[in-house]
Structure formats: structure tokens, C-alpha cells
Amino acid sequence: MKYIKTAILIAGMAAATAACTRKPVVPQFGMLTIDTLIGTPANGCKIEYRFATIANAEKSPALRSIEAANAGYFFELEEFGGTARQAADSALRQIAAELAFPQSAPQMTEPYEISAEAEAAVTDSLVTYIISRWSYTGGAHGMYATECHTYSLAGGYELSTADLFSERQLLGM
């Protein structure tokens, strides 16, 4: 009888420990695709966005935080805290205001273009976004840029190289 009580107690403690140990919610990625033209074909800006959104962001405060931070980076918005769709709408309004072409403006020789694409990957307890941009808004050539952002799935905060490597390892980089 003593052994049965002990076994039940151990099983209960194991079940309680398992119930209290929560794994972070794994993101399920979707794609927010936007193809639009601001202005006219002769005097306008073609916009192409491919944003890797977290479809299940509402399931975890960490995922909501990651989604909002990455939307801010992707759509180039400071201190943004809304949804990816809200970020896209805000970015399009901002671009339209910055590139307001008067009706009487002469036809451009090359139409303006802005293109951004994000890829996301989960590795262990981290999610990494790679944002690639290309734009032409006048001048001799377009501009390219690539950004990488890594977040903790458990806490939703962005990591830096100092969070991932020791001081000695950082000195060797």
C-alpha cells in the first residue's frame, strides 16, 4: 500500500510539472500580399509587398509582439503596435503623401517602384525574419537592402548578437 501511495504521489507530481511547463506557441506563417499602384501608370509608384505574417499571433502575447515589431520593420513604421494589415495601410498612405504627384507633372521616364519581401523561419526557440527590399524612386539606379531580425518565441523580444554569443566570441567576429 505504501508503494502505491508513493507511486500515485510521484505520478501526480509529474503531471503537475508537465502541466506547468508551457512550451512557446509555434508560429504558423501566412503571406500578406499587396500589389498596387499609387498615382497613374505614367506618374506613379508600383508597390509590391510580400509580408510573412503570423497567422496564429492571437494565441500568444509573444507572437503578437513579434508580429507587431516585424510589421514595423517591414513597413518602415516607427513605434508601431497594430496588425500587419494596419501597418500596410499606414505605409501606403505615407508613400502616397510623400510621392504626391501633381496632375500637371510631366511623364516620368522610369516609373517608381518599391518592393519588399519577408521570409520567416523557426529554429529551436527562435524565429528569424529576413526582409529584402528594392526600390527605385528616381536617380541613376535603384537601392537594395537586406535586414535580419531574430526573436525569442518564449518572450517575444528581439535578440541581438550579444544575446547569442559570449563576449569572447563577439571579439572574434
Predicted region positions:
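Sec-dependent bacterial lipoprotein signal peptides
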Residues: 1-18
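Compositionally biased intrinsically disordered regions enriched in Thr/Gly
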Residues: 20-173
